Amino acid sequence: MPELPEVETSRLGITPHLQGQTIKAIVVRTDKLRWPIPQELQKLVGQRVQSIRRRAKYLMIDTPKGSAIIHLGMSGSLRVLDEEVPSAKHDHVDLVLENGKVLRYNDPRKFGAWLYSEVGVAHQVLSKLGPEPLTNEFNSEYFAEKAKNKKTVVKQFIMNNAVVVGVGNIYASESLFMAQIHPKTSVGSLKASQITLLVAEIKKVLETAIKQGGTTLKDFNQVDGKPGYFAQELHVYGRAKKKCLLCSSIIQEEKIGQRNTFWCGHCQPFNK
């Protein structure tokens, strides 16, 4: 599943091709993805793209008339192609530009979304979201206040979009490993020093992943078709039964909140 670094990589990749260009057409080949694709998207035809923003794992293509909101779901991807390139299987939406380029959305599982938002109106999917992890708003003081007296396990806590957005399964496991915190630790029991370290590691892991172009496991490739290289940096995720790169202990795996979770029992001891 594309997570924050993959979505940010997509944003960085499409921005030079879209910003300042005029939308000539929006071609919808599948009328429903995760939700029905709204007819209001056609209001963007003839509009100039002002900016491409990201909020959590949503991309917003902004025009003076309104915005297209895109979520990549489990297997979605965006490619910038020449308009004459024929569509392929699972190519569900084209945003056609007057410069002869097309932003093409491919999604085999159809769990993604294309939505529409009027200017100045916050779409409901963007409400109740926590701060962006790479902003100053997400800091140890904020984390400590949110975690106070909570019995939730720390991995589920940092994956809660109401607490902080964009810390998906891969990066939650990696951040906890780097902070040497067991994923099943009660978040309310964390010491101030652990919180400070965890916040710093979340930021560092995400920043590194963005620089590497995200993580390619099954479905994600960059806009230019190249893989993301953060998979080469993974310490625990997807490495069950392999040796820890730091201490040579065996990496453990267990489902936490229905998500596969990985950790090193030596580097991340579980203190009940």
From Swiss-Prot:
GO terms for molecular function: 8-oxo-7,8-dihydroguanine DNA N-glycosylase activity; class I DNA-(apurinic or apyrimidinic site) endonuclease activity; damaged DNA binding; zinc ion binding. Keywords: DNA damage, DNA repair, DNA-binding, Glycosidase, Hydrolase, Lyase, Metal-binding, Multifunctional enzyme, Zinc, Zinc-finger. Binds 1 zinc ion per subunit. Pfam families: Fapy_DNA_glyco (PF01149), H2TH (PF06831), zf-FPG_IleRS (PF06827). SMART domains: Fapy_DNA_glyco, H2TH. DNA binds at H90, R109, K150. One of its GO terms (biological process) is base-excision repair. It catalyses: Hydrolysis of DNA containing ring-opened 7-methylguanine residues, releasing 2,6-diamino-4-hydroxy-5-(N-methyl)formamidopyrimidine; 2'-deoxyribonucleotide-(2'-deoxyribose 5'-phosphate)-2'-deoxyribonucleotide-DNA = a 3'-end 2'-deoxyribonucleotide-(2,3-dehydro-2,3-deoxyribose 5'-phosphate)-DNA + a 5'-end 5'-phospho-2'-deoxyribonucleoside-DNA + H(+). The keyword DNA-binding applies. The active site is at P2 (schiff-base intermediate with dna), E3 (proton donor), K57 (proton donor), R259 (proton donor). PROSITE patterns: FPG_CAT, ZF_FPG_1, ZF_FPG_2. CDD domains: EcFpg-like_N (cd08966). Its cofactor is Zn(2+). A zinc finger (FPG-type) spans 235-269. Belongs to the FPG family. Monomer. Involved in base excision repair of DNA damaged by oxidation or by mutagenic agents. Acts as a DNA glycosylase that recognizes and removes damaged bases. Has a preference for oxidized purines, such as 7,8-dihydro-8-oxoguanine (8-oxoG). Has AP (apurinic/apyrimidinic) lyase activity and introduces nicks in the DNA strand. Cleaves the DNA backbone by beta-delta elimination to generate a single-strand break at the site of the removed base with both 3'- and 5'-phosphates. This is Formamidopyrimidine-DNA glycosylase. It comes from Aliivibrio fischeri (strain ATCC 700601 / ES114). The gene is mutM.
